Amino acid sequence: MTRDLTPVEARIVGVLVEKQSTVPDTYPLSLNSLVAGCNQKTTRDPVMTLTDAQVLLAIDELKSLHLVLEGSGSRVVRYEHNLGRVLGVPGAAVALLATLMLRGPQTAAELRAHSERLHRFADVSSVEGFLDELAEKSPPRVLKLPRAPGAREARWVHLLCGEVDVAALSVGGAASQMAGGAADDELALLRAEHKQVLAEVALLRSQVQRLADELGVNLDPA
């Protein structure tokens, strides 16, 4: 690539990569489908609200970079990505880059889970291997952020939009992972309380049945 991408351009490329695998029957994408994919409320960070005009303008720029190709042979203009060829990387690396472009910084484990529909990685080590290769390219395509205090794992970020604010992203990652850890702890507590309630209910039923037996009362419904 001859220049860094804008956030809108990165979103468009990420959507095209994603939809190639998730909705192959409608790929390449029409403008309407592409805009809808860019503006999804789920699996997107940040959430965007792009207009047709904004997407078309970005597509023109991406076409000049050979990252997006315009399909032919259809009454509706359709678009497809060319990311792997432009960067000279395999499909597995393309899947990781797209997931980072769509969801923001993530750990290797998160990337493996989130990119499953685009590419199945055997394990987290496989993900880390492709990330290391992308990081060693010239220029680097991804960066491993420093593991922040309190964070369980280091996160990765793509560099297709240029340099990033490492300090800000590291702090944000720590807060996110700590929040995730707190949610896990709360869920474990709720499960423990649920088990305790079930045990108490079982004990009460046993006591009621024993009392009924002593009184000669039949508790079974007629």
Curated annotation (Swiss-Prot):
Top-rank lineage group of the source organism: Bacteria
Family annotation (Pfam families): DUF480
Family to which the UniProt record says this protein belongs: Belongs to the UPF0502 family.
Matches recorded under PANTHER family: UPF0502 PROTEIN YCEH (PTHR38768:SF1)
Protein's name in the database: UPF0502 protein Lcho_2066
Species classification: Bacteria, Pseudomonadati, Pseudomonadota, Betaproteobacteria, Burkholderiales
